[in-house]
């Protein structure tokens, strides 16, 4: 996995507004707050989506993928103009979330990051 693939995977996970949440990393079908890595999570904030990507898929739990995901978060921080991804998530609309992910993808592509 590379930075762009990580950002696209998070975008795919959050594309449906019903799979996005605020105020918690993730939620289960009962709307209870859970960790993004919890297999019962069905809704995710931005950070929870990155957690799912890193820890839910065993094949992605490698050191290289860890760094790709960390770098992807940094591109997202640049895209939103803030170090606080959770605050951005909780104070934004779903449309703003997808727009920020698109911007982060474009920034990574512009810098030819893989």
Spans of model-derived segments:
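Domain-length accessory/inserted modules outside core catalytic folds
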Residues: 1-114
């Amino acid at each position: 996995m590379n930075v762009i693939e990580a950002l696209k995977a998070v975008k795919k996970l959050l594309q449906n507004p019903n799979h996005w949440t605020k105020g918690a990393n993730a939620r289960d079908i009962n709307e209870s707050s859970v960790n993004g890595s919890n297999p019962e999570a069905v809704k995710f904030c931005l950070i929870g989506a990155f957690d799912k990507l890193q820890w839910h898929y065993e094949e992605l739990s490698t050191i290289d993928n860890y760094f790709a995901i960390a770098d992807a978060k940094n591109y997202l921080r640049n895209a939103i103009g803030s170090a606080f991804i959770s605050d951005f998530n909780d104070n934004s609309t779903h449309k703003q979330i997808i727009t920020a992910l698109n911007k982060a993808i474009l920034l990574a592509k512009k810098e030819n990051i893989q």
